[in-house]
């Protein structure tokens, strides 16, 4: 049950982040993980997992020490 809840949270966050990405310009920096976690009322772990998926799929680029950027 906990895993199912986690996947549901990830799906909800991913949908919200995809909307955010659609309205962003390539190269635009996204809010920090803590800011996104607070905005979507989830843990930073959930944000990290979704960002990792989006990076693997080429939607964002994460730069250590700098942030996460839109790739389109």
Language-model regions, residue ranges each:
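Extreme N-terminal segment that seeds HTH/winged-HTH DNA-binding domains in transcriptional regulators
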Residues: 1-44, 49-52, 56-57
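Beta-hairpin "wing" of winged helix-turn-helix
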Residues: 29-30, 55-65, 69-72
């Amino acid at each position: 049950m906990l895993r199912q809840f986690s996947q549901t949270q990830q799906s909800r966050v991913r949908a919200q982040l995809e909307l955010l990405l659609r309205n962003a310009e390539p190269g635009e920096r996204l809010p920090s993980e803590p800011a996104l976690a607070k905005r979507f009322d989830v843990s930073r772990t959930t944000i990290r997992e979704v960002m990792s998926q989006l990076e693997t799929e080429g939607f964002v680029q994460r730069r250590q020490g700098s942030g996460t950027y839109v790739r389109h």
